[in-house]
Amino acid sequence: MGKIIGIDLGTTNSCVAVLDGDSVRVIENAEGDRTTPSIIGYTAEGETLVGQPAKRQSVTNPENTLYAIKRLIGRRFEDKETQRDIDIMPFGIVKADNGDAWVQVKGEKIAPPQVSAEVLKKMKKTAEDFLGETVTEAVITVPAYFNDSQRQATKDAGRIAGLEVKRIINEPTAAALAYGMDKQEGDKVVAVYDLGGGTFDISIIEIDEMDGEHTFEVLATNGDTHLGGEDFDNRLINYLVAEFKKDQGMDLTSDPLAMQRLKEAAEKAKCELSSAQQTDVNLPYITADGSGPKHMNIKVTRAKLESLVEDMVKATLEPLKQALKDADLSVSKIDDVILVGGQSRMPLVQKTVTDFFGKEPRKDVNPDEAVASGAAIQAGVLSGDVTDVLLLDVTPLSLGIETMGGVMTKVIDKNTTIPTKQSQTFSTADDNQAAVTVHVCQGERKQASANKSLGQFNLEGIEPAQRGTPQIEVTFDIDADGILHVTAKDKNTGKEQKITIKASSGLSDEEVEQMVRDAEANADADAKFEELVTARNQADGMIHATRKQVEEAGEELPSEDKEKIEAALTELEEAVKGDDKEVIEAKTQALMEASAKLMEIAQAKEQAQSAPEGAQEADAAPADDVVDAEFEEVKDDK
C-alpha cells in the first residue's frame, strides 16, 4: 500500500509532509525549499510553471501569473469580495456560466479548482521524488471556516491533480495534531490562532492524553475567510502607491508591471519589519513619463506598518471571544496558545494574542509547517500507521431547512462534532399536498432568507391526506470532510430524494463570517421575527380549523353567527399579510370569540358520536409543539 501524504494547500504557500517511521518529514521541493509559493504562471510558450519559477517570471508576465486562488474557490462572481479582488488582482477574474468566479488566462476561462490542482500536482511530484514511488492518496487541509462548496471544490482540485482525497481536515486541528502528538503531559486545552495568507481561523481544542493515546476534540471554531497576509500586503501597497503619487504625481495602479514589482517589494518589506524597526522599499525604474524614468525609495517603519494594519489585527479578537463563548470557557482555562500561518510572525499579532490570553504563545511550533505535519499524522491514522490518535472535529455553521413563514429550522447546530447524522420529521402545510420542497440553508439567523441557500430539491408522490398527516423525515448527514448530504423520505410511501451540496451552490467567503456577526448584531430582530412567525402560524392554523368547522356545521350554524365568523376570518386573513404581531394576535382572539357558537356545535357533535365505534379525535388547530413548515414539524417521542 502506497503512502498517504499530508498537504497544506495554502493561499500564499503550500507544504507537503509524510509520516516517516514514527516521525513526520516535511519534504523539500525541487528548489530545496520546505514550502512552495502557491503561484502558477502560464508562459507564452504554453508552459505551466508552479512555485518559485512562476514567482520569478511574475513581474514580466503579471496577467498570466495567478496567486491567492484559494480566495476564489467556491465563490460567486457577484460577491462583493470578488469584485474587490478584481480591482486588486493583475489577472482577469470572470463570471462562469454557473455564476462562479473563474479566472481568465490567455483568453481561456479556468476554474479555481483547476488552478489549485497545479499546486497539488507540484506537491504530489515533490513527495514522489522523495519516496521513490507513485503517490495517489492525500489528506488536504482547509480553513476551519470553509463552507461545504469550498471543501467540495478542494476535493475536486485533488481529483484533477490525480489524488484521491482521503480526508479534508481543518487547518487549526491539523496544527494541534502536530503540536500534541509528542506531549505526555495529560489533558490540555489549546487555542490555535491561525492567521495565514488569505484566511483567519481560531479553534479551541481539548487534547486528552492517557497511556500514550491522544484524543483531539474541537470544542469550538470561528474565523474570517477573507482576512490574511494578502490583505496586510495590500494595505502596505496602497500606502506606497499613495506616497509615490504624492511625491511624483503619478498613479502606479494603471501599470500592471509596476504593481507586480510593488507587490513583491511590499511582501518583502512586511517580512523584514518582523525583525527590523525600519526598511527601505527601493525600486529603481518603477515607471517613466515624458521627463524620464521614475524611481521609488520610501522608508517604512514597523510603527507605520502597524498603524496601517492595526484594525485588521483587532478584527481577529471578536472570533476569539466567540469561540471561547461557544466552548463555554474563560481565557484562564486555555493552557497553551499555538500560532499558525506566516502572518502570525508579525510582532503586533503576537503582542495582541499575548495580551488577550495573558500568556506567551508556544514557540516550538513552526507556523509554516505545522499544518502539513498534522495532515501527515492524520494520513497515518487513515493508513493504520498511527493507532493512538482520535480526532473529533466540528462543523463551523448551523445547517437546517426553511419552514413555513420563512423560518430556518436548524437540524444540526454549529460546533457539532463530525461526522454526524441527524433527522427531524416534518409534515405538509396544505390538505392533499402531493410534494414538498426541501430548501437547505446554512447560517445562524432565524430568518431563512438572511442565511445562505445551499440548494433545494423536491420530494414528490406524497399520498393525498389532510395537512399534518404525512410524515416527511429529513436527514442531514455530514461526513468526516465536513461535506453535507441531505435526504428527505416519505415514511408512508418510502419515496426518497437526496442532494449533495456542490461547489456551484456554496457560500461566498464574506457571507460565511458575516452570518455569525449578523446573528449576534441582530439578536433582537431575530427574536421579534420569530414571534411574528409564531403568531402567523397560529393564525393560519386557526383559519384552517375554523373554515373546516363552518363547513361541517352546515345548517346548524345560525346565519348571524356565520356572518360574524366570516367577517372575523376576513380580518384575520388580512392581518396575517402584515407585519404587526399584536394585530394578528388580536384578530386571532376576535375569531375565537366569534366562533363560540361554532365550538358549542362541534362539542355537541363530539358527545353525540362518543360511542366506541365512532370515537375519533376532532380535527383541531395545530398543537403548540408542531412547527408549521413549508412543512409542519412532527416531533417524535424518543
Curated annotation (Swiss-Prot):
Residues 613-624 have a biased composition (Low complexity). One of its GO terms (molecular function) is ATP-dependent protein folding chaperone. Pfam families: HSP70. Induction: By stress conditions e.g. heat shock. The modification Phosphothreonine is found at T199. Residues 604-626 are annotated as: Disordered. The keyword Ion transport does not apply. Keywords: ATP-binding, Chaperone, Nucleotide-binding, Phosphoprotein, Stress response. SUPFAM superfamilies: Actin-like ATPase domain, Heat shock protein 70kD (HSP70), C-terminal subdomain, Heat shock protein 70kD (HSP70), peptide-binding domain. Belongs to the heat shock protein 70 family. Acts as a chaperone. This is Chaperone protein DnaK 2.
